[in-house]
Amino acid sequence: DKEKYNSSNIITGESLYHELKEHLLGEPEQREIIRKYEEKLSQYFFDNETITLIPKHDQDVVNIKIGSDKQFPISELGDGLQQVIILTYEAFIKKDETHAFFIEEPELHMHAGMVRQLMNFYLNETKNYYFFTTHSNHLLDMADESDQVIIQKFVKQPKENPKDGFDFKIYRCDRDRDLLASLGVKPSSVYLANCTIWVEGI
């Protein structure tokens, strides 16, 4: 039902300025939430440098101050860090309730270490449910490290009468985790390559 999806529940980052402003100019409890979020950003993504998010007055722009550096617009951050802020802000602000977040390929624009930190942030700092579509072997490997991670595969299968179209079947893929672990095989070894060898001179 398309009417269920609108700007209030599709997160793009466009409302970050107004939400920060609302919290920072609101009650002490709201300001404390932002302070705690800045601490977690620092801990997981900025090597414990002090982080301050500033909705700059009359500019409709969010600035960020990292450590003792001069503040600057978050649009000048790398794409990966911008995406981290977009993907973690709502999840953390609403962490006292339980929500479901549907995220398409969260690994885009991020290096492997940042993807893992993002997953650790979700697992350790929130109690939401997250549904990802991904091509990342690093996300698949998280199934070995946490029993809160489930891998499922969607397979397109024709119906008995091909004229009736097709169905999507869902298969859980992490039930053989113990067997794979005993063989020294990680999920990424099954679904994606762990490495690529480039051979010159052919």
Language model features with spans:
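Conserved strand-helix element at the start of the C-terminal RecA-like helicase core
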Residues: 196-202
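Switch/communication elements of ASCE P-loop NTPase nucleotide-binding domains
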Residues: 41, 55-190, 196
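A short linear hydrophobic-aromatic micro-motif
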Residues: 49-53
